[in-house]
Amino acid sequence: MSRSTSTELQQELPASKEVPPDPTSIASSETASGSKPPSTEFTPRAILVLVGSFLVTFCSVGFTNAFGVFQTYYQEAFLSDKSSSDISWIGSFNIFCMFGCTFISGYLTDRYGPRLLICFGSLVMVFALFMLSLSTEYYQIFLTQAFLFGVGISFVLLPAMATVSLYFAKSRSLAMGIIVSGSSLGGVIWPIALDRLFNEVSFGWTVRIAAFIMLPLLGLACLAIRRPAEFANRPKPKADFSCVKNPVMIFLAIGLFLIFLGLFSPFFYVTSYMISLGKDSNLAFYMVSVVNASSLFGRILPGLIADRVGNYNVLFMVAVFSGLVACCWTKATSVGGIVVFSLAYGLASGAVISLQGPCAAQTVQREQFGVAMGVVMTFLSIAGLVGTPINGQILIPYGYLGLSLFSGLVMLLGSVFILLARLKIKTGLLVKA
């Protein structure tokens, strides 16, 4: 071997053993894959993906946010022989499937891309609604609305969120807030539309009309959402679940699990709370829309701030604020007080929901965005499954004060774990993290 050849080999060896960047840093999520993210984030292609993902959340989580209307209808007409707890399991299991299957859809997104998964999930969602429109028994409603529709959501929601994270690096939290705000808009529109339709047409045609509305919207999402060109020709990555050992990811998942145990209590019970005070039932119905309308801004504005001061910093602050507001729930006894509570809680809780994705994506390399979000959402699925029944069991003996304190305190406890995750990234209190 010549001297020049050996010298070249010696120069190449260190490069092959280069240590990868720390995935827990903010910068690593943008550069750890070895390629830079798009230089211009708000390109026509990126905006198209943003719009498609917005439509996904509007049709999926936004429709799920209207379950309170279904709960009331089932109790009064369709499933009057079933208890409130039995009916609430439909909504709880729907949330469990919606988040629980994301561990699978997240891995498949990283490996095969979002388009086929979103097309599959869209077909499952529409099929589930058509089957729901034909259902007359409790088990049929459970299989279609709770199980099948929830599984369909898991195959459209996470691929959309993970793909948006690939397009946006510096403005990731803002972008995520924009697409998640689609669920807030859906939470405003779907309850009003369903309530009107239930009063004017049959249950079957109400659900079928909802399916016909979703069909073109999800079709547009299937056409719009695709990975950046730089990922199109890359070899399919092997399964990499190393992020589950990351202490930051562990603290984040535990914290969000605790927060989500109490997060949706005001969404589900603010209407019945207002009616229990003797207020107008028609006005009480619109409180759910007030909470969702406020969360529309809560999912966008904090994301804009988080891109500048850090995702974990903002998530910790809004989690604490959500817990404090929830603890003050029963202090609102007038119509004006309940409206103010609904606005404040919607603003704070909306930020918690929109920042879970950016916080998860921040801890891993770009090729693992789907898996990381799937890990977090799997924890949320368990909270969604047991959270509503726990709330119902607390409400019976302890009333709305007990429900308020449980929701607020469990969210405050969850914020402690968010703080631990934040300090694991950077110990300084006044630094971006």
Curated annotation (Swiss-Prot):
Residues 1-10, 25-40 have a biased composition (Polar residues). InterPro entries: MFS, MFS_dom, MFS_trans_sf, Proton-linked_MCT. The chain crosses the membrane at residues 47-67, 87-107, 116-136, 141-161, 174-194, 205-225, 248-268, 285-305, 309-329, 335-355, 370-390, 401-421. GO terms for molecular function: transmembrane transporter activity. It comes from the Eukaryota. Residues 1-40 are annotated as: Disordered. Its main location: membrane. It is a multi-pass membrane protein. It is found in: Cell membrane. Signal peptide: none annotated. It holds the Pfam family MFS_1. GO terms for cellular component: plasma membrane. Keywords: Cell membrane, Membrane, Transmembrane, Transmembrane helix, Transport. Belongs to the major facilitator superfamily. Monocarboxylate porter (TC 2.A.1.13) family. PANTHER family: MFS-TYPE TRANSPORTER AFUA_1G00970 (PTHR11360:SF250), MONOCARBOXYLATE TRANSPORTER (PTHR11360). Efflux pump that may be involved in the secretion of agnestins, dihydroxy-xanthone metabolites. This is Agnestins efflux protein AgnL12. It comes from Paecilomyces divaricatus. The lineage of its organism: Eukaryota, Fungi, Dikarya, Ascomycota, Pezizomycotina. The gene is AgnL12.
